[in-house]
Each structure stands twice: as C-alpha cells, then as structure tokens.
C-alpha cells in the first residue's frame, strides 16, 4: 500500500526521535545504576524500552506504507552528568517530539491516513505520561533540593 510522501517523511522523523530517545534513556539508566540509583535506573530503562516499542510500531507502519525506515539517522544525545541534567535532557526530547506529533496528527488526517494518526495519538499519550513524570521529578528536586532528592533515590540494601 503506497503511503503519502509527507506522512512517510513525518514517520521517519519520528522514528529518528524514538531511536535517539532509546539510546539517551538507556545510557542515563546505566549511569543512574552506576551511581546507586537502581530504582530510578529501572524506571528510566523502562522508558527506553517504551521508546523501542514506539520505534517498532513506526517501523511496521512505514513498511506497510511501502516506505523505508531510516535507521541510519539518529539525533545527538544529550547526556546529563547529574540527575537534574538527565531529567532536563530527557524532557527536552519529549517537548521536541510533542511539537512534531500534534501537527503531524492533523497532517495525517488531512492526508486521509487515520491509521498513522491513531498510531501517533497513542505515542502522544505515552509521551504525555513521561513528560508529567519528568516535570514532577524536577519539581520535587526544586522543592527538596538536589541533595535531599538524590538521597531519597538511593536504593537501600535489603535488611
């Protein structure tokens, strides 16, 4: 089934964002684990896997539309050296994604591609949850201070 070139371009742009997020979140997860924030690291790792599921769904859609998924392009990773920097970097990716997705959904509907629009709407719902989580963590960090916030995130060995 031949897809609209504009829809395919949008889907490949979104695929690039998902591939970038997978790598950034996974690296942040491993850094958090190394710093002793194992529960936080697990949450970040799960977010990386969520982005992988998005990439898979987008890839399937591009292939169905007789397009070629571009796995050779990836955006620059923003690697945070502190928890705050990591949350801010991850939030920046999410904001960029949302600025593309919402107009993209409208464009898909205008091009009579409701299936791609629904796929992107599902991704928006997931990204909104991640944005809420990241904004909450940054707000908590602001209220508690970075040291106290970080102390709350350290995993304690089982007793």
UniProtKB/Swiss-Prot annotation:
Biological process terms in GO annotation: intracellular iron ion homeostasis; iron ion transport
Name of protein: Bacterioferritin
Gene3D superfamilies referenced in this protein's UniProt entry, alphabetically: 1.20.1260.10
InterPro entries tied to this protein: Bacterioferritin, Ferritin-like, Ferritin-like_diiron, Ferritin-like_SF, Ferritin_DPS_dom
Residue ranges of domain Ferritin-like diiron in the record: 1-145
Originating species: Mycobacterium leprae (strain TN)
Bilayer topology term: Peripheral membrane protein
Family: Belongs to the bacterioferritin family.
Subcellular compartments: Cytoplasm, Cytosol; Membrane
GO cellular component terms, A-Z: cytosol; membrane
Broad enzyme group: oxidoreductase
Cofactor: binding details: Binds 1 heme b (iron(II)-protoporphyrin IX) group per dimer.
Role, per record: Iron-storage protein, whose ferroxidase center binds Fe(2+), oxidizes it using dioxygen to Fe(3+), and participates in the subsequent Fe(3+) oxide mineral core formation within the central cavity of the BFR protein shell. Probably plays a crucial role in the intracellular existence of this organism by functioning as a temporary depository for iron in iron deprivation.
Subunit text: Homooligomer of 24 subunits, arranged as 12 dimers, that are packed together to form an approximately spherical molecule with a central cavity, in which large amounts of iron can be deposited.
Family matches, as SUPFAM superfamilies: Ferritin-like
Binding site for Fe cation 2: 51, 94, 127, 130
């Amino acid at each position: 089934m031949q897809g609209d070139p504009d829809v395919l371009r949008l889907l490949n742009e979104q695929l690039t964002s998902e591939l970038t997020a997978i790598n950034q979140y996974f690296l942040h997860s491993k850094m958090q684990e190394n710093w002793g924030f194992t529960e936080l690291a697990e949450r970040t790792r799960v977010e990386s896997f969520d982005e992988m599921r998005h990439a898979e769904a987008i890839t399937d859609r591009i292939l169905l539309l007789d397009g070629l998924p571009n796995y050779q392009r990836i955006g620059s990773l923003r690697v945070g050296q502190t928890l705050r920097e990591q949350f801010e970097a991850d939030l920046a990716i999410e904001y960029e994604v949302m600025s593309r997705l919402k107009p993209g959904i409208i464009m898909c509907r205008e091009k009579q591609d409701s299936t791609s629009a629904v796929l992107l709407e599902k991704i928006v719902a997931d990204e909104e949850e991640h944005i809420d989580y990241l904004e909450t963590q940054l707000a908590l960090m602001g209220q508690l201070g970075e040291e106290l916030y970080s102390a709350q995130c350290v995993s304690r060995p089982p007793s």
